[in-house]
């Protein structure tokens, strides 16, 4: 059942965002939890940060206790109070095989009792960082991240406080990982369309009712994306053999010139650039 568990084929529309990382986490949990890592083979250490020899030596023979996610980061908790961060960068993917079949751009291979778990990264922007369990959340990669969008902490009252004195556009605010962790270009466009809010709206001009719509849309869009295996991943098969693409449910992202699914014949989706990133919206129904 787990042969070629991750059938990504390394095709991305964009950097993996929270739903793609969460989908990866859930799949890895099926394979790795309570398993001992018998071998760590660093095939190519050339990632964003070079994989140290220390990483291989310390991770080897440790058991995987749990795998968490913070924003777009995976956090592996191991036995003997060790932990490490994994970030997928632009094109990082894991695959699982019963027999290791080398592929171009393989970087790290983890050997457990029945399977090989391989990290592959074409563009080499991903990385792995070893730390202690006690210190992992104080890592410079994690300690400045904002709140988790799917947590109970994200409520309308808190969101209003966050945007109250911000003079930037709402799209840029949502993209800022220091405020809310894990949102990226695809989901920010989808969230704002769902909420009926223009990406150009200035934060401190957004009403309490509009803020509530954004918060509800954040949770709704992300949960639906996770349920459908994410957007950026192509040909993804989860541990139950289900294949699904959230790209089938995109309302605005990458739909420039197409008819708005809310307004029907009366308006088309526009594309504009905000902070060097493509942004998609309907000028008629997003105010």
PLM segments and residue spans:
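Short, contiguous clusters of charged residues that form electrostatic/catalytic patches at enzyme active sites
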Residues: 19, 23-26, 157, 161, ...
